[in-house]
């Protein structure tokens, strides 16, 4: 079982898609440390195998009690993971402290293959550089890293280059998040049905080089099965493209 706790709305970024509509300062209605421990107690009561307990936000590093809570959850047998933002708080020292508290897995967001694309989406300059630096620091510490990429019109043509970054820097998983138009994301450009088919087929191809999964793209499993069957029948290349009715975005 997986439990995701949005521990705070506070975040230094201004991401264009943020469903939490994060703000620079913490909300007084956030769970206190005692309430957070109670939440972890409840999650731990679910039994074995231990729950994967993801602490996110906002930016989870905005909570000064983050390491304390991570250690508490780890002590209960929870598999505590973090999903921090690419800010100046994402340092090797901070990651090492969390690793000492029992955190061995983090997820980071990479929404462009270049600083220009990623930073424009995240609303703050240097976010791309900080994310790459945090990614490499986590890997140097021996932590496992999942890379999450929102898939929308702003970056769809950069997906192959993002895949190359995942391949070169190493990650346990690359997850493509098909844009959910909620929060600040209601006005962003979602892909249409034909374009989604093209993207999911591209993810299938890129999965030969990097470990790929999707979020809010449940039909990726259907595409994977179709492609597996076609490959078994020797249907590849242009014949596959025609059979799957793929469009210009895939090409």
For the regions a protein language model found, what residue spans apply to each?
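Conserved alpha-helical substructure of the radical SAM core
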Residues: 1-101
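Radical SAM enzyme [4Fe-4S]-AdoMet core and its adjacent flexible, acidic
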Residues: 26, 79, 99-101, 109-111, ...
């Amino acid at each position: 079982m997986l439990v995701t706790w949005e521990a705070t709305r506070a975040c230094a970024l201004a991401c264009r898609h943020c469903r939490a509509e994060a703000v620079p300062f913490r909300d007084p209605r956030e769970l206190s440390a005692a309430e957070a421990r109670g939440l972890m107690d409840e999650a731990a009561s679910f039994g074995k195998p231990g729950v994967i307990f993801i602490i996110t936000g906002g930016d989870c590093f905005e909570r000064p009690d983050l390491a304390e809570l991570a250690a508490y959850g780890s002590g209960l047998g929870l598999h505590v993971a973090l999903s921090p933002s690419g800010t100046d708080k994402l340092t090797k020292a901070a990651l090492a402290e969390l690793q000492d508290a029992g955190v061995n897995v983090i997820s980071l967001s990479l929404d462009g293959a270049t600083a220009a694309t990623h930073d424009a989406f995240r609303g703050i300059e240097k976010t791309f550089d900080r994310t790459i630096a945090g990614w490499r620091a986590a890997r140097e510490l021996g932590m496992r890293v999942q890379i999450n990429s929102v898939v929308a019109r702003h970056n769809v043509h950069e997906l192959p280059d993002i895949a190359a970054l995942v391949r070169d820097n190493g990650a346990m998983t690359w997850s493509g998040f098909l844009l959910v138009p909620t929060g600040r994301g209601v006005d962003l450009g979602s892909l249409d049905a034909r374009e989604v088919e093209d993207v999911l087929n591209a993810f299938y191809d890129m999965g030969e080089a990097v470990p790929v999964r999707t979020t809010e793209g449940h039909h990726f499993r259907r595409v994977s099965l179709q492609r597996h069957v076609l490959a078994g029948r020797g249907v590849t290349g242009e014949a596959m493209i025609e059979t799957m009715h793929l469009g210009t975005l895939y090409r």
